[in-house]
Curated annotation (Swiss-Prot):
This is Mediator of RNA polymerase II transcription subunit 1. Residues 405-644 are annotated as: Interaction with THRA. It comes from the Eukaryota. The gene is MED1. Residues 1496-1505 have a biased composition (Basic residues). It comes from Homo sapiens.
């Protein structure tokens, strides 16, 4: 064993020794160094590869440790800085002292200076070739040891130079970026200096938004949009008040400015391009130097606006952006997806919640007291058949700094749209079967328009709200509901809420709450609805009947987006549309007549109600909740008791009230059953065409229908203020407050429809919006005001009709009427809260005291967002400007005073001469009386401004402010045409001087402007405004019932119908306002008196009365006439007797300074009206006006002018019809509604004579022409309205004097004219204007404006022309000239304000933008002028066939075919037409009438007056009995004596005028209607 073990061991040793030997042998060999080095290298490489992972891990661990360590020493700080530099790929090193750390790259370096203790001293950044500059932001970050932010800055600096090319090229690119930043900074400073805007204004409206300069690594930031919800604190839900120190970078929507490399080469500036420090236009556009080789370089790079998060944009937006920049937005074709899907993703991505939401495009919103479910119909087909597609945009390329403002505006528009749609996208989860869950469908209609459909809060029907995002701060809204559906709220209310909260759920909640409020206020609604349904059960017009659709694209969103255009689309277009709508409906719906009548006719509604609950009844059925089902009270009894009602039910074409009031967006939209999509698609063109085609057929088709419609129109005007709304937009009534300025729309704009040829429903709303803006107060203020007013007004049971369009808008004409008429409403927030409805809504939406509305939740009053938006300059130009200019001066005060004044003047003052006078004076002083002109507003506002202003003016009150001005303008206008002067042709000019031109002779005219101003200051103008307001009825052309009409329709019930709304037409500064305020007020007073005198027109009478009371002479006269015709009937009567004396006085007054042309006119008007009436022919023509020969306009002008007119009229049958025509018209007006129409023409002549007569004596040619025109228009309208009213009540049947036929004819003609008035693109609008009472008035105003404006310049010419015209046609010529001369500044806005008798908040029916006579005088102004003049003229010729010259203005009227210049006797009409035609001789024609025709007219009129006075007395007595209850209404009218008078006249006039303007101006096809009206009137005679 032992031996064996040893053996094994030895073997092992031997093996080991052999192994060692081998090793020794191997390593003893000489190995070459190359092999050794190679071997070592291989080993090292392997080692690196192996340790790479571990190294990274070690580095990350080290960095984590460093972050966890507190930096308290110098070494710790330098270590941390070096670590951060390494993370960003930058080098770092320390200085010799160890206290400076440098972080470096090729293009820049950062120097961090520390003290020995490691505390930070300073941080400097040095770009290539520049000296180091201290960076406070970096200092702050390092002092706070915020190393993450410091690291982000370093990343930003690195990315800034992440450009192609070498360092030299990168340096040039940096220089280009620097120059761009300097230019943008200058632009921001320019905007701030020009507007002194706060942070929110800068964000929403600034040319470059809220600019934050580049700092450290943060690029220059442009904050371009912030929504109301962004301004709420997430934690406390309290509003964030922005100031310069608390605008965080992350707030709202931002874009950073940078330069990046591109594949293409672009020429970029490397030096600043802005020269000087002042912008070159009102959009703050700086002056840029041109791009040259000296200041720019070709670089493979371009400027970019980059967004932190890609923004969903529509396909159309992409195209707009590329058109703006000229550079493709995407290098490769983007992928498109449904826009709503992208918006949904964008909204959900804001929430950090990682849990995906399985929404299926269905979202829930839990609101106070309500739970909503929203379905976003992303695949809904657009009109082109495709769904709304979009894509995501992360950056926008541009080359020039001047492109930035355009790009930002486009982005703001898109983001505003996205914000509204995104407001429905919430992560809230509710059960499908939750009790009370409300379902809503959001459906795209275009890239900027969408609809929200939901169940009617009261009825079992579908309601649709169409929202059109016109720009980032203006959203126009239109509510579509069934004709029989209860009123929900006004379009303006919705728009206000939307703009305030930019949230669909909050808006829907506010709408529902508003509807509930209305229902609570109108408990009898269901009963009424049932009755109406029973009535028209057999022949209910199809919901989609054209009539409804008639809404004419106007109300729908289609139409110009500009506030101004919007307005035209609104009031004028609307009015036109309304008439058209009615006809359309007639044609389309043969059997809905009863229903349509009930639903459309506020008068009918009020008649049905019997209770005199005109207010509630007033709204069109679609419009008013009350009216929704016309009140049923005792329909049979009512029908029996009211011939007018019988007539309405009998022949009334199946006109939707909504159609009639279609002007009012809400009304129209409510009434229109057509889907928003349809309406939108059809657009205004469709409507126009429809109207045009329909109207003409309508005439032949419904002769009786035409008559009936006319009657209805005037009735509508009387009975439903909503009609006034019609002209504006549905919300116009509210608009006075709401109306920013439409504005401001521009948009609307808002109820200040321009005579724009194209009807634009959607614009209307916008207009209103602008109107709102112009209203002046912030949305918040307005909202709070509204909330307050709403609390007051709700009692009126008006949703938000209190002051303005809401009434009509709300589709509750009656409702709105009551608010309008309610003195409470007027007085309540006369000055600033005309928007009762909006107030309520806002209260709801904004969390008014009474409401738990989320609005409060979302934005408190403190939130400036919406107000800013509303007031934003981007309001389409009709924002604050309108409101501020017009109303800021005395308007508000006047308005305030006017609330009660309006009531008093409208109601009481008119009723009692002394009383009216006292009230007027007390409230408005003499000027108060001068309502008709008041609306002109002393300020020299641009047409848009004026309109806006009118709109802005809260109502009559507001107007009163303007009234003073407008009174002057009115006077001027009266020189131009008292009634129309409200429209204030001169005012249109917006030239103060011209405007100053008064109805009185040139000398007087000139003086008058001061008076007008005085009136403004005195505050009388407010009254006048009120008086003018009656002029507004024209606004409600659709509801041809004008105040007079309204009063009338109310009168028919024999109950005090809701006070007749006063209609004030405000005209731009340029507007001609003649006479000093006191003088003017006197004038108005006279006008009022004459109005009152015409008992036919209650409103007129009231107007008259107030007018009388205001004017000194008129005062006594008025006290007599006023008290006698206090109810309008008595007023009329006394006017008859005292009218003669008044007319005499008037004439005298004309000469007397104290009397002042206006007073004279007023007196003249009254006298004229009486006398006119005596002029059997015109009277006969206007049969209904027997008692009210000259409707307010007539009255206004006729008193003094009447004498003159009466004589001149007689002598001038062949003479220039201007005077004659006016006289005849005046008398005609007095004679009957037809007379009213002719009256308007006559009125014009009468005005010229009357107003000129007193005033006209001084300024017969030009001022007369204008005043005659105005007066004529007003008178005619008023007369028609009033007459119809009266007839409706006293002679509901067809008065012996053809009153009804006349009225009907007038209405039909108006409608036809309206429909017809589509000859030209602009014509339709004008036509529409004409059609709308407002339109008519406005056209008058525009014409007068021209006259007035021109008058200033042309006034002297006019005066000269007067002499000339006396013999020749100088009146017409003058008018023309005025219009021509006014061409330049003629454009203006005429505002028609309708006030309620009860003194309810005034409402602005329509805002008419008057175009320059030269440019649009033919189309816009002319039609307007033509409208008023034509109106009067046809009536005149119809009225007084012997005044064939007058007939020219009626050239359309069969009796007076001549529309030639020789027909200058048309005076108003002819002038309107001619001036539109720019035919000097025509103008001259008008003036001549006043001069030589005056005496004959006076005689003639006196004779006729005697006859008519008797009739009037009789009528008056009847009316008194019937109207005593309505006394208030007349008084309301009386609030604006002249206005009332005129407005009534205007109403009729407007209606007729609408037709006539068509004739007068080729644009207006209304002429045909005029002919028909004239025929009817003549035949009726």
């Amino acid at each position: 064993m032992k031996a064996q073990g040893e053996t094994e061991e030895s073997e092992k040793l031997s093996k080991m020794s052999s192994l060692l030997e081998r090793l020794h042998a191997k390593f003893n060999q000489n190995r070459p160094w190359s092999e050794t080095i190679k071997l070592v290298r291989q080993v090292m490489e392997k080692r690196v590869v192996m340790s790479s992972g571990g190294h990274q891990h070690l580095v990350s661990c080290l960095e984590t440790l460093q972050k966890a360590l507190k930096v308290t020493s110098l070494p710790a700080m330098t270590d941390r800085l070096e670590s951060i530099a390494r993370q960003n790929g930058l080098g770092s090193h320390l200085s010799a002292s160890g206290t400076e750390c440098y972080i470096t790259s090729d293009m820049f370096y950062v120097e961090v200076q520390l003290d020995p203790a490691g505390q930070l001293c300073d941080v400097k950044v040095a770009h290539h070739g520049e000296n180091p500059v201290s960076c406070p932001e970096l200092v702050q970050q390092l002092r706070e040891k915020n190393f993450d932010e410091f690291s982000k800055h370093l990343k930003g600096l690195v990315n800034l130079y992440n450009l192609p090319g070498d360092n030299k090229l990168k340096t040039k690119m940096y220089l280009a970026l620097q120059s761009l930043e300097q230019d943008l900074s200058k632009m921001a400073i320019m905007y701030w200096k020009a507007t002194n805007a706060g942070p929110l204004d800068k964000i929403l409206h600034g040319s470059v938004g809220y600019l934050t300069p580049r700092s450290g690594g943060h690029l220059m930031n442009l904050k371009y949009y912030v929504s109301p919800s962004d301004l709420l604190d997430d934690k406390t839900a309290s509003p964030i008040i922005l100031h310069e120190n608390n605008v965080s970078r992350s707030l709202g929507m931002n874009a950073s400015v940078t330069i990046e490399g591109t594949s293409a080469v672009y020429k970029l500036p490397i030096a600043p391009l802005i020269m000087g420090s002042h912008p070159v236009d009102n959009k703050w556009t700086p002056s840029f130097s041109s791009i040259t080789s000296a200041n720019s370089v070709d670089l493979p790079a371009c400027f970019f606006l980059k967004f932190p998060q890609p923004i969903p944009v529509s396909r159309a937006f992409v195209q707009k952006l590329q058109n703006c920049t000229g550079i493709p937005l995407f290098e490769t074709q983007p992928t498109y997806a449904p826009l709503y899907e992208l918006i949904t993703q964008f909204e959900l991505s804001k929430d950090p919640d990682p849990i995906p939401l399985n929404h299926n495009m269905r979202f829930y919103a839990a609101l106070p007291g309500q739970q909503h479910c929203y379905f976003l119909n992303k695949d809904a087909p657009l009109p082109d058949g495709r769904s709304l597609q979009g894509t995501l945009v992360s950056k926008i390329t541009f080359q020039h700094p001047g492109r930035v403002p355009l790009i930002l505006n486009l982005i703001r528009h898109q983001v505003a749209y996205n914000t509204l749609i995104g407001s429905c996208v919430k992560r809230t989860i509710l059960k499908e079967d939750s009790p009370g869950l409300l379902q809503f469908e959001v459906c795209p209609l275009s890239e900027s328009r969408f609809s929200v459909s939901f169940q009617h809060p009261v009825n079992d029907s579908l309601v649709c709200v169409v929202m059109d995002v016109q720009d980032s701060t203006h959203v126009s809204c239109k509510l579509y509901k069934g004709l029989s559906d209860a009123l929900i709220c006004t379009d303006d209310f919705i728009a206000k809420v939307v703009q305030r909260c930019m949230s669909i759920p909050v808006t829907m909640r506010a709408i529902r709450r508003k509807a509930e409020t209305i229902q609570a206020d109108t408990p009898a609604l269901s009963l009424i609805a049932e009755t109406v349904e029973d009535m028209v059960k057999k022949n209910l017009p199809p919901a989609s009947s054209p009539g409804y659709g008639m809404t004419t694209g106007n109300n729908p969103m289609s139409g110009t987006t500009t506030p101004t255009n919007t307005f035209p689309g609104g009031p004028i277009t609307t009015l036109f549309n309304m008439s058209m709508s009615i006809k359309d409906r007639h044609e389309s719906v043969g059997h809905g007549e009863d229903f349509s009548k009930v639903s459309q006719n506020p008068i009918l509604t009020s008649l049905l109600q019997i209770t005199g609950n005109g207010g509630s009844t007033i709204g069109s059925s679609p419009t008013p909740p009350h009216h929704t089902p016309p009140p049923v009270s005792s329909m049979a009894g009512n029908t029996k008791n009211h011939p007018m009602l019988m007539n309405l039910l009998k022949d009334n074409p199946a006109q939707d009230f909504s159609t009639l009031y279609g002007s009012s967006p809400l009304e129209r939209q409510n009434s229109s059953s057509g889907s928003p999509r349809m309406e939108i698609c059809s657009g205004s063109n469709k409507t126009k065409k429809k109207k045009s085609s329909r109207l003409p057929p309508e005439k032949p088709k419904h002769q009786t229908e035409d008559d009936f419609q006319r009657e209805l129109f005037s009735m509508d005007v009387d009975s439903q203020n909503p009609i006034f709304d019609v002209n504006m937009t549905a919300d116009t009534l509210d608009t006075p407050h709401i109306t920013p300025a439409p504005s401001q729309c521009s948009t609307p704009p808002t109820t200040y429809p321009q005579p724009v040829p194209h009807p634009q429903p959607s614009i209307q709303r916008m207009v209103r919006l602008s109107s709102s803006d112009s209203i002046g107060p912030d949305v918040t203020d307005i909202l709070s005001d509204i909330a307050e007013e709403a609390s007051k007004l709700p009692s009126t049971s008006d949703d938000c009709p209190a002051i303005g369009t809401p009434l009509r808008d709300s589709s509750s004409s009656g409702h709105s009427q009551s608010t309008l008429f309610d003195s409470d409403v007027f007085q309540t927030n006369n000055n600033e809260n005309p928007y009762t409805d909006p107030a309520d809504l806002i209260a709801d939406a904004a969390g008014s005291p009474s409401s738990d509305s989320p609005t409060n939740h979302f934005f408190h009053d403190g939130v400036d967002f919406n107000p800013d938006l509303l007031n934003s300059q981007s309001q389409s130009g009709f924002g604050e400007e309108y409101f501020d200019e017009s109303s800021q001066s005395g308007d508000n005060d006047d308005f305030k005073g006017f609330a009660s004044q309006a009531l008093n003047t409208l109601g009481v003052p008119m009723l009692g001469g002394d009383n009216g006078e006292t009230k007027f004076k007390g409230n408005n002083q003499a000027d108060t009386v001068d309502f008709s002109i008041i609306s002109v507003a002393g300020k020299a506002l641009a047409p848009a401004d004026l309109m806006e202003h009118h709109s802005g003016s809260q109502g009559p009150l507001l107007t009163t402010g303007d009234l003073g001005k407008e009174k002057t303008q009115k006077r001027v206008k009266e020189g131009n045409g008292t009634s129309n002067s409200t429209l204030s042709g001169p005012g249109l000019d917006s030239k103060p001087g011209k405007r100053s031109r008064t109805p009185s002779n040139d000398g007087k005219s000139k003086d008058k402007p001061p008076k007008r101003k005085k009136a403004d200051t005195e505050g009388k103008s407010p009254s006048h405004s009120s008086s003018n307001r009656p002029f507004t009825p024209p606004t409600s052309t659709g509801g041809s019932k004008s105040p007079g009409s309204a009063g009338r329709s109310q009168t028919p019930p024999g109950v005090a119908t809701p006070p007749i709304p006063k209609i004030t037409i405000q005209i731009p500064k340029g507007t001609v306002m003649v006479g000093k305020p006191s003088s003017h007020s006197q004038y108005t007073s006279s006008g009022s008196v004459s109005s009152s005198g015409s008992k036919s027109h209650h409103s007129h009478s009231s107007s008259s009365s107030s007018s009388a009371s205001t004017s000194g002479k008129m005062k006594s006269s008025k006290s007599e006439g006023s008290s006698s015709s206090k109810l309008s009937s008595s007023m009329y009567s006394s006017q008859g007797s005292s009218g003669s004396s008044q007319s005499k006085n008037s004439s005298q007054s004309g000469g007397k300074p104290g009397s002042s042309p206006i007073t004279k006119h007023g007196l003249s008007s009254g006298s004229s009206s009486t006398k006119m009436k005596p002029q059997g022919k015109p009277s006969s023509l206007m049969n209904p006006s027997l008692s009210k020969p000259n409707i307010s306009p007539s009255h206004s002008r006729p008193p003094g002018g009447s004498d003159k007119l009466a004589s001149p009229m007689k002598p001038v049958p062949g003479t220039p019809p201007s005077s004659k025509a006016k006289s005849p018209i005046s008398s005609g007006s007095g004679g009957s509604h037809m007379s009213g129409t002719s009256s308007s023409s006559g009125m014009k002549s009468s005005s010229g004579l009357g107003s000129s007569g007193s005033l006209s004596q001084k300024t017969p040619p030009s001022s007369n022409s204008c005043t005659a025109s105005s007066s004529s228009f007003s008178s005619s309208g008023s007369s028609m309205s009033s007459s119809q009213n009266q007839h409706g009540s006293s002679k509901g049947k067809s008065p012996s004097r053809n009153k009804k036929p006349s009225l009907t004819a007038v209405i039909d003609k108006l409608k036809h004219g309206v429909v017809t008035s589509g000859p030209g693109g602009e014509d339709p609008l004008d036509g529409q204007m004409g059609v709308s009472t407002n339109s008519s008035s406005h056209p008058m105003s525009s014409k007068h404006n021209m006259s007035g404006g021109e008058f200033q310049g042309k006034r002297e010419k006019s005066d000269k022309d007067k002499s000339k015209v006396s013999t020749s046609g100088s009146s017409v010529d003058s008018s023309k000239k005025t219009s021509e001369s006014k061409n330049v500044g003629s454009t203006g806005v005429a505002k028609i304000i309708i006030s309620k008798h009860d003194g309810g908040s005034p409402s602005i029916k329509a805002k008419v933008t008057l175009q320059k006579p030269g440019e649009s005088s033919g189309e816009g102004l002319r039609p307007q002028m033509a409208s008023s003049k034509n109106y009067g003229s046809p009536l005149i010729s119809g009225s007084t066939p012997k005044h064939e010259r007058g007939s020219p203005s009626h050239s359309k009227s069969p009796a007076y075919t001549p529309q030639n210049l020789d027909s200058e006797s048309e005076s108003g009409s002819s002038i309107a037409e001619k001036s539109y035609q720019n035919s000097p001789s025509s103008d001259d024609g008008i003036r001549p009438l006043p001069e030589y025709s005056t005496e004959k007219h006076k005689k003639h009129k006196k004779e006729k007056k005697k006859v008519k006075d008797k009739d009037r007395d009789r009528d008056r007595d009847k009316d008194r009995d019937k109207k005593k209850s309505h006394s208030i209404k007349p008084e309301s009218w009386s609030k604006s004596p002249i206005s009332s008078d005129q407005s009534l006249s205007m109403t009729s006039n407007t209606i007729l005028s609408a037709d006539r303007p068509s004739r007068l101006s080729p644009d207006f096809m209304i002429g045909e209607e005029d002919d028909d009206l004239m025929d009817v009137a003549l035949i009726g005679n």
